[in-house]
Structure formats: C-alpha cells, structure tokens
Amino acid sequence: MTTTLERGFSEEQEALVVKSWNVMKKNSGELGLKFFLKIFEIAPSAQKLFSFLRDSTVPLEQNPKLKPHAVSVFVMTCDSAVQLRKAGKVTVRESNLKKLGATHFRTGVANEHFEVTKFALLETIKEAVPEMWSPAMKNAWGEAYDQLVDAIKSEMKPPSS
C-alpha cells in the first residue's frame, strides 16, 4: 500500500485543503446536499444505490433522509482530507472504514461511481470557494479524495463468515 508521503500530499496541498474547508465548514449542510444533487444530476441511476431513495416519490431536495446522509458523507470526506498529511494516512476509524467498504460492496458501488462522486465533490468545492479555486487546489482535493477512496476500496469485500 502506498503511503501518503509517497503519493506526495504536500504541505501546500494540506494548506489549500484546510483553508478551503475552514470556509466551507459553516455551510456543510447546504454543500453536502448540493454535492449529492450533483451526483444524481450526473448519474441519475446512482439513486438506486440508496435504499431510502429507491422507491421514494419525494423530490430529492425534500427527502428527509438524503440531507443527513449527504452532510455526513461530505463532512467525513472533508475532515479526512484535512487530517491526511498530519496522520500520514486516511483517518477514518478502522471500524467505520470496514463498514463503509462493506456497504459500498453490498450496494454494488463501482469505480465509475467513485469517479462521478469525485467530479461532483470538486465542482461543489469550486462553487463554494470560487475566489480560492485553482488547479493546485483541485489537485489537492483530488488527491485527498483518491486516498480516501483507496482506503474504502481496500475494505470492499464480502463479509467474512
């Protein structure tokens, strides 16, 4: 497994991620929902991966379960990115990582889904902090996201019996 430092999450990247997250944090509810709405705009079929959306007739923006889920995913992703350099690895608790891996495996999440999610995340951040956005910031968030996804994928396997 490649470590963070081998993959090159630099001090500069960390600073860009921390600075932008500090600005976005206060709007994490709104941004989390925007993030997921972007995912479903790009890939409407992704809705069927979520049991609480599968048979729902409620508009996405009004679904009572979507916003809390979206916020928790957005905040976990951003918090993980902020901690990446300091910890030298993804800092989601191992039990949570196993649960995330098992859930993503069980629901049939594929590589394409992670790519769509990455694009939606970067677009959400770009819109949230347009005055800070730069190619360097895009690369920093992209690298942090890729490392989180690698950690989740390493746990995407059938439950051990």
Curated annotation (Swiss-Prot):
One of its GO terms (molecular function) is heme binding. Residues 8-157 form the Globin domain. A motif (Homodimerization) lies at residues 41-45, 111-123. Predominantly expressed in roots, cotyledons, stems and nodules (confined to some cells associated with the nitrogen-fixing Bradyrhizobium symbiont), and, to a lower extent, in flowers, young leaves, pods and seeds. It catalyses: Fe(III)-heme b-[protein] + nitric oxide + H2O = Fe(II)-heme b-[protein] + nitrite + 2 H(+). Induction: Strongly induced in roots by waterlogging, but down-regulated in leaves upon waterlogging and drought. It is found in: Cytoplasm; Nucleus. Binds 1 heme group per subunit. Its EC number is 1.7.2.-. It comes from the Eukaryota. Heme b binds at residues 51, 65, 69, 99, 103-104. Its cofactor is heme b. GO terms for biological process: response to flooding; response to water deprivation. The record marks 138 as: Homodimerization. Phytoglobin that reduces nitrite to nitric oxide (NO) under anoxic conditions (e.g. during flooding or in waterlogged soil) and upon root nodulation. Required for general plant development and during nodulation, especially for the onset of symbiosis. Monitors nitric oxide (NO) levels during early phase of the nitrogen-fixing symbiosis and buffers oxygen in functioning nodules. May not function as an oxygen storage or transport protein. Has an unusually high affinity for O(2) through a hexacoordinate heme iron because of a very low dissociation constant. Involved in water stress tolerance. This is Anaerobic nitrite reductase Hb2. It comes from Glycine max (Soybean). The lineage of its organism: Eukaryota, Viridiplantae, Streptophyta, Embryophyta, Tracheophyta. The gene is HB2.
